[in-house]
């Protein structure tokens, strides 16, 4: 059986050297998004909202909202509503976002609602980790999933308990940033690499002058910049477009134990080894037969007798030779030749690494 491997570089041969821009390899320290979260209500659902008996917080939230709008609900009223759902609203506040800017929000059901399709999110304050309100969200929810049910049968495509509102929140407060102050910025590499940190630092020094950049460790580079704000923006825009010629990177194999997917980059190399792969299958089948007496007046009685059959089957197990692979195509061909499933391949790759046949970093998620 052929094994389909997801490869970052594809199955085609790729050159070992490539050019990238500094902006694709680094980020500027302090220039980042900030997470926002809020609790709100979605109304206008077509009978697919929360069951109020199971989610009392939905009823409580609705009472509080109506009270703020001047609508008094008599104490002890049992509100059986099916078109309201309690939700959590999340968003990301971009760096340098200003008041009045719109951002996207994600709405997720918190209770027992079956679907948020067709619902409208009521005004929801979005707070940061400092408990300050930075945005207000409201609008119609777009749900990508769909579903139908009838006669006890149900068909559903994708999730119905979550959706998005494009531009559904308006920024009310910006996050303070000290980007314009000071004459130093920090570049952070996306991945730890001493060689790449030194390479980027050398490229910046060649472009702007000696000692403009200094690598502090495998991830951080200190860069001297003009003190004024506009000059710093122009400097950083020019810096981020400096090309960097990348050499060989670390060989990495990433295994997702939940989905069974295996991802490897083009630098993975296999050493020569022999692999024996097989499965022990035990099948237990139980059948029932009716036993009745031969003579109708012999005094016997009809009984049901269970019969159990056990079959033990050992499949595979042949020793297979794997030649050393110098590129991704050779590695994929060798692993496909084993005929293992993705789940079996996880154990095989771990064993290969233990014996020194897999010259790569193995990451299991």
UniProtKB/Swiss-Prot annotation:
Signal peptide positions on this chain: 1-19
Pfam families, per the entry: FlgI (PF02119)
Coiled coil region boundaries: none
InterPro entries for this protein: Flag_FlgI
Single GO MF descriptor: structural molecule activity
GO CC aspect terms: bacterial-type flagellum basal body, distal rod, P ring; outer membrane-bounded periplasmic space
Keyword terms: Bacterial flagellum, Periplasm, Signal
Places the protein is found: Periplasm; Bacterial flagellum basal body
Family: Belongs to the FlgI family.
Subunit structure: The basal body constitutes a major portion of the flagellar organelle and consists of four rings (L,P,S, and M) mounted on a central rod.
Role, per record: Assembles around the rod to form the L-ring and probably protects the motor/basal body from shearing forces during rotation.
Protein name: Flagellar P-ring protein
Origin species: Sodalis glossinidius (strain morsitans)
Organism ancestry: Bacteria, Pseudomonadati, Pseudomonadota, Gammaproteobacteria, Enterobacterales
Gene: flgI
């Amino acid at each position: 059986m052929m094994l389909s491997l997801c490869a970052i570089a594809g199955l085609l041969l790729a050159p070992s050297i490539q050019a990238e821009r500094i902006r694709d390899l680094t980020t500027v320290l302090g220039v980042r998004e900030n997470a926002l979260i809020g609790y709100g209500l979605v109304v206008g659902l077509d009978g697919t909202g929360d069951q109020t008996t199971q989610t009392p917080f939905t009823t409580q939230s609705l009472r509080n909202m109506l009270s703020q709008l001047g609508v008094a609900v008599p104490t002890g009223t049992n509100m059986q509503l099916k078109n309201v759902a309690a939700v959590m609203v999340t968003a990301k506040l971009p760096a340098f976002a200003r008041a009045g800017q719109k951002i996207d929000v994600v709405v997720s059901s918190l209770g027992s609602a079956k679907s948020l399709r067709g619902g409208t999110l009521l005004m929801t304050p979005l707070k940061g980790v400092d408990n300050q309100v930075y945005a207000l969200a409201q609008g119609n929810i777009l749900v990508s999933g769909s579903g139908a049910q009838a006669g006890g049968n149900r068909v559903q495509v994708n999730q119905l308990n979550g959706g998005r509102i494009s531009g559904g929140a308006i920024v009310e407060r910006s996050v303070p940033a000290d980007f314009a102050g000071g004459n130093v910025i920090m570049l952070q590499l996306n991945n730890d690499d001493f060689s790449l940190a030194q390479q980027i630092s050398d490229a910046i020094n060649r472009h702007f002058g000696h000692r403009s950049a200094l690598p502090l460790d495998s991830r951080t580079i200190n860069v001297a910049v003009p003190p004024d704000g506009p000059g710093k923006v122009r400097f950083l825009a020019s810096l981020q477009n400096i090309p960097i010629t990348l050499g060989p990177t670390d060989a990495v194999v990433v295994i997702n134990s939940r989905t069974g997917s295996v991802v490897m980059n083009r630098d993975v190399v296999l050493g020569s080894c022999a692999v024996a792969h097989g499965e022990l299958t035990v099948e237990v089948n139980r059948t029932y037969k009716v036993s009745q007496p031969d003579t109708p007046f012999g005094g016997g009685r009809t009984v049901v007798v269970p019969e159990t059959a056990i079959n033990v089957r050992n499949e595979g197990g042949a020793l297979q030779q794997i030649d050393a692979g110098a590129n991704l195509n050779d590695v994929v061909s060798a692993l496909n030749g084993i005929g293992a499933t993705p789940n079996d391949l996880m154990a095989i790759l771990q064993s290969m690494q233990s014996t020194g046949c897999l010259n790569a970093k193995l990451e299991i998620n």
